[in-house]
Amino acid sequence: MRLLLIAVALASALGAGRAGAAEFRSAGESAVILYDAPSVKARKLYIVNHGYPLEVMVQVEGWIKVRDATGTLAWAESRMLNPARTVLVRAAAVNIRQKPADDAPSVAEVRRDVLLGVVEPAAGGWIQVRHRDGATGYLRAADVWGD
């Protein structure tokens, strides 16, 4: 019986798919200060600019522990974070494509650390994004961080 329960739990965890995917938020309307503890009296570590994607690790009253694109863990005031999704380009340079296919025409080229808005979350290995200049298209999800 115990082995059956373990097998069921393991199958459930493996089948979670997108439901178990990481949760992300973005830095709100202004720059967000990241702290080493959940308090404004804690040591200030650094600041992230508007729109920067942050992975949610833990939420406690008024605070969210986040991970940035470099893997650094810090605390942010939850009121300073926005549910709007953004991603950072990780590849040296990639083309935003008209359709989710490697042979689709390019709409724009973007370089590492460019911030893009998420139009549609990743599906089939591609994510639909929007550049601040208005260009909209698809990138491979592996080429960005934040989804």
Where are these regions (language model features)?
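Bacterial N-terminal signal peptides
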Residues: 5-15
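SH3-family beta-barrel domains
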Residues: 18-36, 44-52, 57-100, 105-135, ...
